[in-house]
UniProtKB/Swiss-Prot annotation:
Protein name stated in the entry: Granule-bound starch synthase 1
UniProt source species: Aegilops tauschii subsp. strangulata (Goatgrass)
Principal EC category: transferase
Protein family: Belongs to the glycosyltransferase 1 family. Bacterial/plant glycogen synthase subfamily.
Keywords linked to the UniProt accession: Amyloplast, Chloroplast, Glycosyltransferase, Plastid, Starch biosynthesis, Transferase
Pathway assigned to this chain's UniProt record: Glycan biosynthesis; starch biosynthesis
GO CC terms of this entry: amyloplast; chloroplast
GO molecular function: alpha-1,4-glucan glucosyltransferase (NDP-glucose donor) activity
Main location, first listed in the record: plastid
Amino acid sequence: ATGSGGMNLVFVGAEMAPXXX
């Protein structure tokens, strides 16, 4: 996942979700 600070956690969740989306 990419991003900085807390935002990285948001992208991590998106990547783990199906169709990410």
